[in-house]
Amino acid sequence: MKGLIDLSLVNGIWTLKLSMIQTVALAIVTLYLGEFIKKHSSFLQRVSMPAPAVGGLPFAFLCAFLSYYKVVNITFDGALQSFLMLAFFTTIGLMASLNVLKKGGVAIIFFWIVCTIWIVFQNGAGIIIAKAMGIEPIFGIMAGSVSMMGGLGTAGAFGPHVEELTGVPGVASAAIAAATFGMVAGTLLGAPVGDRIIKMHNVPTPVDHPELLEADGIDINESDSESKLFDLQSLMHVIAFVGISLGLGTLVSAALSSVFGPLPAYIGAMIVGACIRNYADFTGHISINGAALDAVSNVSLSIFVTMAINSLKLAQLVDLALPLMAILAAQMVLITIFAYLIYWLFKRNYDSVMLGAGAIGFGLGATPNALVNMLSLASKYGPSPKAWLVVSLVGAFLIDFTNAFLITFMAKLI
């Protein structure tokens, strides 16, 4: 067994070091464990809790228990985790099509701007509470837009990056823990707040006024010319574009870092990916299959986030539990206010209610949470195709661009 299992005694505690391959294999096992548990839990399905969190958190707690009682410490090789993180954010860039943005018109740009401004409030509130609670201000940003507006993907990417830059222990684990909390809170809060706004202001809905849908002019069921299926060649094209974006992205990131200071490695890859996507759209010389792109994005995200959660150092969060909960409670209050603000800014109609409910979903968790909130309201009051399109586009990739820059900028200020 020598060479297969790296188990040694370090400072009187047995330490198990998992290789890169073993780390990936474990991530896949816990990912499918999460899928199995979620499949048999109506609550987890209702709140759209991602399988990586469902399977990874129990394992992280087990590791914390074994470490706390000095049974064994388990360490992980995160080399492939970093690569998968870069690949995922590159696919976000490859989704940034200007042609798609045109379908939503001014509403998309306005909603994007409003959500970008809200990032400043999320981080500002987090920093203020962190300082008041006597912890490092950087935890305020980790429990701010990194984990709230950013979700598990951004938390898993920025957490280790910021922890390495600042040298503050527990930063990465705090970001993941806050993002996991936000996934649940975003779904539990969104639809009830939207329902409350509708009833409080007697907002006309499509159920009672079918003409609202006719006036909308957007058909969410309108199929594009692209097949929902993909072949091996389409998949290889996407993988090639991701690889090219990663390579050229290192040069872009280096150039930007020389001007703006240290930036996450994926920024350059996202920018190059967006350039490739729009070159493809406007020239037609190359094609990017959306289904293949989604597949690469989902696989890289699922394994990357599962690896990040598996390696959570929960023991480092014991002293941060109360301050983190205070910050997260404040974020829930603020995002509720934000939903009401969106209602007043966007014509005070049914679309604006749906935008608010969606904003709670991806403002605390992720885009799937936002869509679940909107589906919940739609099942009772009718659909809002325009809001669905706007939230999908802003939450899925647009907000990631501005969030990344604002996180980096505000982190430097503290």
Residue ranges and their predicted role:
Residues 37-53, 70, 74, 192, ...:
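Flexible hinge motifs at transmembrane-helix junctions and intramembrane kinks/re-entrant loops
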Residues 15-29, 75-89, 138-145, 260-272, ...:
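Structural signature of hydrophobic alpha-helical transmembrane segments
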Residues 128-135, 179-220, 341-350, 395-414:
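Juxtamembrane and boundary regions of transmembrane helices in multi-pass small-molecule transporters
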